[in-house]
Amino acid sequence: MILRNPLKSPFNSELSIFKALLMSTITESISNDYSRFISILGVCKTTDQFKQLHSQSITRGVAPNPTFQKKLFVFWCSRLGGHVSYAYKLFVKIPEPDVVVWNNMIKGWSKVDCDGEGVRLYLNMLKEGVTPDSHTFPFLLNGLKRDGGALACGKKLHCHVVKFGLGSNLYVQNALVKMYSLCGLMDMARGVFDRRCKEDVFSWNLMISGYNRMKEYEESIELLVEMERNLVSPTSVTLLLVLSACSKVKDKDLCKRVHEYVSECKTEPSLRLENALVNAYAACGEMDIAVRIFRSMKARDVISWTSIVKGYVERGNLKLARTYFDQMPVRDRISWTIMIDGYLRAGCFNESLEIFREMQSAGMIPDEFTMVSVLTACAHLGSLEIGEWIKTYIDKNKIKNDVVVGNALIDMYFKCGCSEKAQKVFHDMDQRDKFTWTAMVVGLANNGQGQEAIKVFFQMQDMSIQPDDITYLGVLSACNHSGMVDQARKFFAKMRSDHRIEPSLVHYGCMVDMLGRAGLVKEAYEILRKMPMNPNSIVWGALLGASRLHNDEPMAELAAKKILELEPDNGAVYALLCNIYAGCKRWKDLREVRRKIVDVAIKKTPGFSLIEVNGFAHEFVAGDKSHLQSEEIYMKLEELAQESTFAAYLPDTSELLFEAGDAYSVANRFVRLSGHPGTKNWKSTVR
């Protein structure tokens, strides 16, 4: 039985129809009726069915027919989207392929990104005398790799577009705009766009997307304004792109204009568009509007919730951020990381690590961005034990250990005082960037390895990596820690002469501190006096410390008074000024300062110490007794005080400036009470 019309077949499935039709070709005596095979081709749904048909056409002698070969090839490429290597086997059998066949083959190679095979095929097409059409170039341009070679090839194809008179074709123009924008040449893309593309909204979207990709958000926003002037109605894609730009430049006025446009549309806004509005308003700091839209949404997803959480985090309102975070029905990796990073930015390092522990308990696997935030928290706390565990966790879970994670590990190890481990991470890294080298220079400098830091600085330049202002700060710090005054002067001069980097306040401060420590107080003051910007209290503080160290009482008094002009409530400086006047026996001035301290109720900010024990960082503030073991700690301190008295120890109380020693002692007693007397990773400071 020959089934001429598949639609009238008694079989109730496409597979049955296909099998029946294929069987008919086997039982029929006529072998060269290719139209029969073409009709069967119409019901092929899978590559296996296609290959069965192809095999049968070869057996029955139909395959060599040029018309059938072309139909077979085009069907494989366009309807089934089959593998390109099989398509090529079909292609080479077609005698004198026309432009449609060539285009399908070029499209196939372009899709699989086969190292310029599509372009080579195009050149063969030209050799065969086949003229390209408006479909040829979009296939070629969209298939180019995004590298330097792609741009050169794309420009040559652009010349061919002009040569064959296709420069005014909209599809070709859009392909050129896309190619240039993906290669980062927005000026070239704009040149093509400005010629003829302004009637097509898809062209506008390509341009806005390109500007966003290049972080030229103001240009994206300007294009929307130009769209309105050209009476081109934006699509939802346009609005999504523009809202993304608004969120980057914090343009709340444009955000409101887009919102008004959405509100005026009769169609219901999509979830994606509502999410984009929430995110844009939150990024612009308009949290009231963002929350109002969020609450009015009929449906919300994890992106909706995350936008609100992120908005509050960026505003520094961690309380509300945590409230919304805790209410989230579903949390993804991004929402967890935002909360971890929020606490990190607020200086709540313990809380940041606690959120990470909750993330693990929830079974959520972090990514490299999460790990960078966690490692940074460990670095600030000096939590080596947790930092080591994080490194093991990264290796065990095969989290992407890229250059950013490597940089965070280097920073963490240096801040925990483990210089050797930091250097091992550096040497084990497959890739390094400017920040890697800078982290090494700064880390070595801060760990007292000035010579090694300078050696790395020169190695960095040997690798053709140019230092920046942070790198130079590390080098100057290295000279400071190692007492290399002459080299510091040379580096300070080289900032401008060799790398055109203008020294900032911190660079001047480092020079003042270094010269002061070296006893060159007058030279330090001259640098401070000639600074192109007004010195802050930190720079004056460096001069103050140096003046006290080298008994330059007049300079110390000058520096102290300058600090008090900037920070009238700085209790520590008032205390030091009292010590200066007492040392010079200027009792009248001393009484005046003390009277002022009493009159304005000035208090000095207490010092604090951090100590890591059993994977947890404990903080001790001078005079504070909130720790659970405070009673035991202070009892132990009392015992030590009595023992030192019996040992005839007389403390030096002439300088009562800093109370950090109190916090330091409390932390020290806690370590011994905890049974970890060898703990090293802790620090004492005044805030």
Curated annotation (Swiss-Prot):
Region (Type E motif), start-end ranges: 539-614
SUPFAM superfamilies the record matches: TPR-like
Domain of life: Eukaryota
Keyword Secreted: no
Protein name: Putative pentatricopeptide repeat-containing protein At3g15930
Entry's Gene Ontology molecular function annotations: RNA binding
Source organism of this protein record: Arabidopsis thaliana (Mouse-ear cress)
Repeat (PPR) residue spans along the chain: 98-132, 133-168, 169-199, 200-234, 235-269, 270-304, 305-331, 332-366, 367-401, 402-432, 433-467, 468-498, 504-534
The family this protein is said to belong to: Belongs to the PPR family. PCMP-E subfamily.
Gene: PCMP-E51
UniProtKB keywords: Repeat
InterPro entries cross-referenced by the UniProt entry: E_motif, Eplus_motif, Pentatricopeptide_rpt, PPR_At4g14850-like_plant, TPR-like_helical_dom_sf
Positions of region (Type E(+) motif): 615-645
GO BP term, pick one: RNA modification
Covalent S-S links between cysteines: none
